[in-house]
Amino acid sequence: MATDLAMSAELPNSPLAIEYVNDFDLMKFEIKKEPPEADRYCHRLPPGSLSSTPISTPCSSVPSSPSFCAPSPGSQPGQNLVNGVNNNNNNSGNGNNNTQGSSGKPQMEDLYWIPNYQHHISPEALNLTPEDAVEALIGNAHHHHHHHHHQPYEGFRGQQYVGEDLSAATNGHHHPVHHHHHHHGHHAHARLEDRFSDEQLVSMTVRELNRQLRGFSKEEVIRLKQKRRTLKNRGYAQSCRYKRVQQRHMLESEKCTLQSQVEQLKQDVARLIKERDLYKEKYEKLASRAFNGGGNTRDPSSGNHVKTTSTDFFM
């Protein structure tokens, strides 16, 4: 903070310098996609410059702040950037009242938003437009002015948060680094879990699931596929248990039916045995009666005749 105050005291209050800074329009610059090895050139300062802004490098999407000792090349159209910075600082509260003068001119500290830009953020991986980059820089500069330390900008999020509003970070809603990543990871996991129901995960084909999971991180995809595999194994186990129970019930019912049939057959056998015994007893009675009757009526003269009669009876 003492360094910032010393720099602001040494900087001139020249109207030409202020006008030169106000005339810068970042909307006409595009985000350049460069290899990551160009990061080592991001933090070099131009020799002889009073500004603490790093030199414009391929890894930066905005030009460097001009030196206040250089003359103004002329007026250029547009003052949108500094006006946005001033409006943002005026709406944020009374934190900047101690550093603003009574003359109504924009403070020099408000113009130093570029040094606060975090160069480790890679804009080409976020599909950001120049308007989003300007909003991010304005919000990040305001946050650093109040808290005096670097914190991540909430607007820079992963590919899976493209649909969310990037302007939420300009309202001062900042959190610590570990809370930031923890909450975002939890919300992403919850959103991915809630996107598919259990029935959809089980019934969906692998090709359709892979098509739906494009754009999500590898860990979340692996976690969701593990959940799908667990649900399918659980469903298969339940199906096997249901089939076993159903088969057991069917076998038990068939066993009961066969046992009843066996009992019926046993009863039939017992009844037939009883009938057989009755017929056998009747036969023995009739046989004994016929034998006794034939023996009493037989005489010597007609023995052959009686014998023939007995034989005819049995026939």
Curated annotation (Swiss-Prot):
Family annotation (SUPFAM superfamilies): A DNA-binding domain in eukaryotic transcription factors (SSF47454), Leucine zipper domain (SSF57959)
Biased composition (Polar residues): 298-315
Disordered: region residues: 52-108, 169-191, 290-315
Feature: compositional bias, Basic residues: 172-189
Listed PROSITE patterns: BZIP
Basic motif as annotated region, ranges: 223-248
Subcellular location: Nucleus
Segments of this protein annotated with the region Interaction with DNA: 229-243
Sequence segments annotated as region (Leucine-zipper): 251-272
UniProtKB keywords: Developmental protein, DNA-binding, Nucleus, Transcription, Transcription regulation
GO molecular function list: DNA-binding transcription factor activity, RNA polymerase II-specific; RNA polymerase II cis-regulatory region sequence-specific DNA binding; sequence-specific DNA binding
One Pfam family per UniProt: Maf_N
Keyword Zinc-finger: no
Described purpose of this protein according to its UniProt entry: Transcription factor, possibly involved in transcription regulation during lens development, including that of crystallin genes. Specifically binds to the alphaCE2 enhancer element of crystallin gene.
Family: Belongs to the bZIP family. Maf subfamily.
Descriptive protein name: Transcription factor MafAa
Species this chain originates from: Danio rerio
